[in-house]
């Protein structure tokens, strides 16, 4: 952070330790920064350490380094805003793009100028929110996340908790828009889809699905959307089998997302290593090694490139007249055989 007596300090609710950074607030900040840069005005932005740990924080700001303070967006209200007036009393203080709840409150009267978005005290009507004219943003992938924490029938082979923890930690570092989705339908909970058509409509609008569920895989492909799949069962189970049946290659084994702990001097993968659930890893301890994410990264890139066409091809194949056979194709014959066995007292043993 460069200092200069004529610098401007830019603040907002995104600056407070116990504030919050909304997308609208940060876009409003981008609009203000665009204007300041265009005018050649030097400035620094204060961030909450809880949101941007590597940014400039109030704890390290020298008030004497600034002659002006801007407060951007949100309601001008409360003790946190009032504290700005006390700490930066020597600065010209301006609120821009804000809402005024109580014009007589110290939080409002402490500003030298208030450029409100709701028109309060300006003698004019409401103004356009600053976020509307913020600089354009790049598009990022929209990713549906469909995970399960159940399937206890797999007993000791279950790695569902570790897989979910590893996947979500990895996803948190990806520049994408994540949507947590459920294949479970519910007629009463507005958060969940009530019909298959509703869920399929959501899936069809995604760029990618990340899942450890069989139906997360199949429904994504049915919608023509690539799926990055992790089988949560050690050694592989129904998820891996279904991926093979669909002809879908982007499957990662659970073992890749399970951390390992060193016991003694053993090398990675040797008997001296103990398998450890990802959620139990103690970070910072030298004897722990994190899960491998290289395979996830490789399939992520493939799914967002060639995988798009492959998923569309497979999805179209599901609906084709000459689609690959499924178990229902032989159902009528089995039902007929069953009826004959019931009438005649004989029947054939089910096929293995």
Language model features: what each stretch is:
Residues 1-352:
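Active-site anion-handling motifs in enzyme catalytic cores
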């Amino acid at each position: 952070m460069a200092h200069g007596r004529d610098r401007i300090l830019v603040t907002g609710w995104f600056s407070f330790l116990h504030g919050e950074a909304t997308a609208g607030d940060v876009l409003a900040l981008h609009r203000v920064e665009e204007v300041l840069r265009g005018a050649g005005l030097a400035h620094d932005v204060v961030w909450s350490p809880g949101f941007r740990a590597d940014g400039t924080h109030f704890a390290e700001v020298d008030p004497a380094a600034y002659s002006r303070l801007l407060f951007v967006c949100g309601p001008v209200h409360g003790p946190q805003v009032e504290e700005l007036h006390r700490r930066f009393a020597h600065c010209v203080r301006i609120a821009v793009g804000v809402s005024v709840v109580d014009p007589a409150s110290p939080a409002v009267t402490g500003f030298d100028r208030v450029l409100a978005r709701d028109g309060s005290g300006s003698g004019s009507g409401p103004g356009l929110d600053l976020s509307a004219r913020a600089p354009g943003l790049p598009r990022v992938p929209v990713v549906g996340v469909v995970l399960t924490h159940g399937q206890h029938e797999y007993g000791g082979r279950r790695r569902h908790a570790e897989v979910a923890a590893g996947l979500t930690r990895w996803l948190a570092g990806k520049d994408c828009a994540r949507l947590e989705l459920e294949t479970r339908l519910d007629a009463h909970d507005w958060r969940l889809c009530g019909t298959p058509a509703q869920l399929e409509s959501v899936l069809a609008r995604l760029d990618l699905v990340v899942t450890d569920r069989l139906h997360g895989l199949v429904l994504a492909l049915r919608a023509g959307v690539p799926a990055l799949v992790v089988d949560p069962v050690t050694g592989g189970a129904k998820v891996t089998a279904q991926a093979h049946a669909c002809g879908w290659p982007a499957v990662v084994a659970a073992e890749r997302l399970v951390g390992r702990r060193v016991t003694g001097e053993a090398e990675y993968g040797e008997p001296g290593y103990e398998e450890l659930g990802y959620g139990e890893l103690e970070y910072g301890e030298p004897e722990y090694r994190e899960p491998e994410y290289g395979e996830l990264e490789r399939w992520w890139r493939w799914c967002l490139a060639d995988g798009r066409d492959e998923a569309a091809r497979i999805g179209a194949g599901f609906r084709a007249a000459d689609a690959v056979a499924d178990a229902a194709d032989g159902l009528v014959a089995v039902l007929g055989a069953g009826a004959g066995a019931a009438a005649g007292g004989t029947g054939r043993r089910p096929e293995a």
